[in-house]
C-alpha cells in the first residue's frame, strides 16, 4: 500500500501541471454555461456553422437573417468548421461551443507555463505566472465565451513562444507566417498576431542586431500570400466582397479618420474600467487596469535606464508586444471589449519578470494570485443562478422547436435550423417595402417570442438604436398585430428579456410568447 501511495505521489509531482490543468478544466465545466450570460454573438457564430453542415458548403449566409444584409465570406471559415466538428461530436448546444473556448484556454495556459520556463528559468515562477492568468476573471470569461477570442489568444501566445524559442532562420519566418495566415480563417483579429510578430522582429533587428531584415520580409511575404488567397476566396464567394465588407466595417467606425481612432483608445479603456457596454458583459477588471500601467511604467523605466537590451531582451519583447497590441486597437478602430484579453497575459509576464530576482517573489506572486482569484469569485458568483437552460426550457414548454418563430437570436440553440427569424430583420422592412404583418405572413411565422427590451429600446430611442435599428417604422404596426392577430399564451421573467448588459439585472424583465392566429 505504501509503495502505491509513493507511486501516486511521484506521478502527481511529475505531472503537476497536467493535473492542475485537468482540474481547472473540470471545475470550469461546472459553470461553463452560467458565466458569463449567453450573448447572441455565440449563437450567431454557431448558427452559421450549423448552416455550413446543413448545406455542405461555406458559400452560405445565416438562415435567421432574411432581410438583414449578409454576404458569404471565408474570413472565419476555419472557426466555423471547428465548431461544426465539435457539434457533430457533442451536439448542438451552448455547452459544446463554449467548451471549444475552454479547451483553447487550457492549451493557452500550458504555453504560458512554457514561456515562463523560457524567460524566468524557474518552474515555480512559471507556475505562478500560469496560475495568475488562469485565475484572472477576463481569462475565465474568454475561456467561457463561444467566440474566436480564445482561439486567437492561443495563437498569439503560441506564436510568441515559438518566436522566442527558435533561432533565427528561414524556416522560423515561414512557420510564423503560416500561423498568422491560418488565423485569417479564424477572425480578422489575426492582425494582432501579425502586429505582435512584426514588433518582435523589429525589436531584435534594432536592439539585438542578430536578425536580418530579410527574415521579417519573409514573414511578411508568407503572411501576405495567405491574405491574398483569402481575398481571392472571398471574391469567389462574393464578387462585391470589398464593397460589402466596407459597408459592414462602417457600422463599427472601422474606417474612421486616424485622429478619431487615436482619441477613441482613451474611451476604450475608460469604458472597460467603468464597465460601460452595450450588449457585451464586461467583468470588473479595475484592479488590472490600475495595476498594469504601474507594471508597464516600472518595466519601461528599468528597460531605458539599464540599456542592456540583450540582458533585458524578454522584457523588451513584451513591452514591444504590448505597444503593438495597442497600436492594432487603433488601426482596427473597432475597439471591441472582448479583445482586451490579448494584452492581459503579457502584463502578467511583465509583473513576474520584474519580481523574479527579489527574495520574496514567490510570496508576492501567491498573494497576487489569491487577490486575482478573489476578484474573479466576486465577479462570477452573481451569475451562478443565471441558467440559460431555464430560459430555453420556458420557451420549449409552449413552442415546438420545429415551428417558425420570430424571436431574439439568443433562442437559436433551441430551434431547428431555418425556423428562427431574428428581430434584426425588422429594421429592413421599410427598404423592402413590407409591413410587420406582411413579414409575419410571408414567412408563415407561428409564434412570436417577444422580449420586454423591445419596449424599453423604443421608449428610450434613439439611444439604443444600434441594437435592432430604429424601431419607429414598425413598432406601432407590431403592437397592433400582437394585440389583434395573436394570442398571449405565456409570460415569464428572465434576464434574457433584456440584452443591454447594464440593465439585465436591474429589475425583472419579461418575455411574452404569442401564438399567431391565421
Put a short name on every predicted segment:
Residues 117-120, 157-173, 183, 355:
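Membrane-interface transmembrane helices that cradle and orient dolichyl/undecaprenyl
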Residues 190, 332, 354-356, 363-387, ...:
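Transmembrane alpha-helical segments
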Residues 46, 102-103, 142-143, 149-152, ...:
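Hydrophobic/aromatic-rich transmembrane helices and adjacent perimembrane loops
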Residues 355, 453-518:
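Aromatic/acidic, Gly/Pro-rich catalytic loop(s) in extracytoplasmic/lumenal soluble domains
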Residues 27-31, 43-74, 78-81, 85:
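Extracytosolic helix-loop segments that constitute the early lumenal/periplasmic catalytic or substrate-binding loops
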Residues 18-22, 174, 178, 220-225, ...:
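Signature aromatic-anchored transmembrane alpha helix within multi-pass, membrane-resident enzymes
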Residues 18, 99-120, 158:
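Transmembrane-helix motifs of polytopic, lipid-linked glycan transferases
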Residues 51, 194, 198-310, 333:
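Transmembrane-lumen/periplasm boundary regions of multi-pass, lipid-linked membrane glycan transferases
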